[in-house]
Amino acid sequence: MKYLCLLLCFLSFEFSSAQAQCKTVPVSKAWAGNSVNAVVFRKNSLVTYKNVQFIAFYNQKGKLTLGKRKLNASKWEIVETAFNGNIHDAHNCISIMVDGDGFLHVSWDHHGNPLNYAHSVAPLSLQLTDKLPMTGLNETNATYPEFYKMPNGNLIFLYRDGRSGKGNLVMNRYDVKSKAWTQLHTNLIDGEGRQNAYWQACVDKKGTFNISWVWRGSPDVASNHDMLFARSTDGGISWEKSTGEKYTLPINEANAELACSIPRNSELINQTSMTTDDSGNPFIASYWRSANSTVPQYHIVYNVDNKWKELDLGFRTTPFSLSGVGTKRIPISRPQVLVSGKGDKASIRLFFRDSERNDKVSVAVCNNIAQNQWKVSDLTNFGVGSWEPTYDTELWKDKKSLHLFVENVQQVDGEGVAEAQPEMVNVLEVK
């Protein structure tokens, strides 16, 4: 099935105003009663190794389901695994990644649960091992599993140890040569027993691991505040600020680099996205409400020449509040950001979903951030409910080809579940 979409196309990695086609490739029908299959913090939902693309989702029975295809093919091989997930909790998503030898790694079903992890029995296989420990350390209370692939084929794995408002960031590393995990940090970012970091991260083309986060002091989303930053140039062992100043670990509220000051009760969302420009400068996408406004807007926080800057995109008109606990039904998605070019002349694409645009897959494009002029277009002519954008990071890094995971899902406020029929999971191939 194909849908016509509007997109500001990529040409030689620069944006230009043009129309293009998006090809929507159906995969399989899946659970859609909440947003567990379509939350922004799935790292990853889609991933490509050489010419094989993998996908993961929960089916209507709550089974961890895997799929693969050859790139540009329309037929998927789908396998329902023996593993289950609590599909009634939108936190309990699936994350996948493929290591440098082609083994698929999977982690799923966490919201203060013992770590669930397995990997494929052979390269490019959809058959998984039994459930395995990673390191056996700090694996009893895990949330938000995320994989990141390093240029040498090794993997980094992040998760929260603890609960909302009182948790620590754990970092593990997988070595493809030894095929073993080691724990690099039990407490990379220390909440000091009174708050925790809600992070987003990325790896640039040189292998620098960038991480940014907001602090939260309670389960109430309204307690989110500030945007902080750290990076590692040695595979996650040592950490520094954007200036090169070394961190004394663990990072905490007192020594963390402040990228942007954002007060509590600003409708600041947690767990969004970040990327880097062609020079490795970090770009962080989020949304919050400025002090003189009632309307939360998308913002870009970025660093150029050792100076932090912030852009208010300003195109939204509808107010809303994030106060409360649990996964909420929110009129906009958390954003996904991609950048080309360098510094103040970089071009940005921000992918999102907004009820103001009938909940379609949309993109805001700025060709020159020094001018801060944005053009907003819809990529689909169909709505996607409470979907949030995730994409195939490795395909983008390797081939600058953009594939989005898309499913029309519903989310009831306060961790509720909708009476929804299964919906088709699609890969939206942006040409």
What are these regions (language model features)?
Residues M1-C22:
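Bacterial Sec-dependent N-terminal signal peptides
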Residues Q21-K431:
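Extracellular, repeat-based ectodomains that mediate carbohydrate processing or recognition
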